[in-house]
């Protein structure tokens, strides 16, 4: 899946380089399309086709109420921010402070294509692959093992150290939600909300504030012109802080239940059987190489 998608991305990258060399302007939406198209239109279909050949476990679906859904959602916030801090610090440390998050270039693009990919397409396809396809096939070896493996593969899939840790943490919550409900709509909706908050609302609020104008601004006109933006941004930031604190409390107090299975792997054999096989090793090595390339770029 990854190799086919990256191969197509390289071809599109050569096309992009050729256009730039010939002084042809490339809009942000086209760059976004070149990045997303190979993975979601080529890599994922191949991945789904391969996974179909692996027997899966079908379990009864269980519903959750709105209150529990909201509680699980806000548990993602402290995990997301803590993971983001770890990923950013580690990226800066390993690159000598030179690394930049490639995703930032696209998040401030206001094209409808970005919203479609980030908020709709990515959550649906990623949850279908990393939650349903993987967990349905691995949960018989232990629910904890399946969730951890799913989250690890999900984190590596981003091939971006800035995103790796918070993707892993959020993947644990989404994996738990899917494992307990076996209903994909809950994890998809959570994923959509998280991506909407980080990929649409946050860039929109930041772009509504003219930071350059406010730097050292002493005149009242400059302050007044940004006042509404600051009020909205501050209210949103305060709400996130409150919800993040609530998420920490819920994480500490909520009991997470895991059911045992007949074929559950013994503790001493889990890592060897799950992560030390040829497929997992090749996938991990490939993603790590791409992460290193991204840091060095």
Q: What would you call each of these model-derived segments?
A:
Residues 1-10, 71-82, 279-287:
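Alpha-helical transmembrane segments
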Residues 1-3, 9, 32, 39-43, ...:
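Small-residue packing motifs within transmembrane alpha-helices
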Residues 10-15, 45, 49-53, 81-89, ...:
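Hydrophobic membrane-targeting alpha-helices
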Residues 10-22, 85-96, 197-214:
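Membrane-helix interface motif
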Residues 16-74, 92, 102, 244-265:
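Membrane-helix interface linkers and caps
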Residues 21-30, 56-128, 136-139, 292-297:
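Juxtamembrane helix-loop-helix connectors linking adjacent transmembrane helices
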Residues 113-296:
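Transmembrane helix-loop-helix hairpins at the membrane interface
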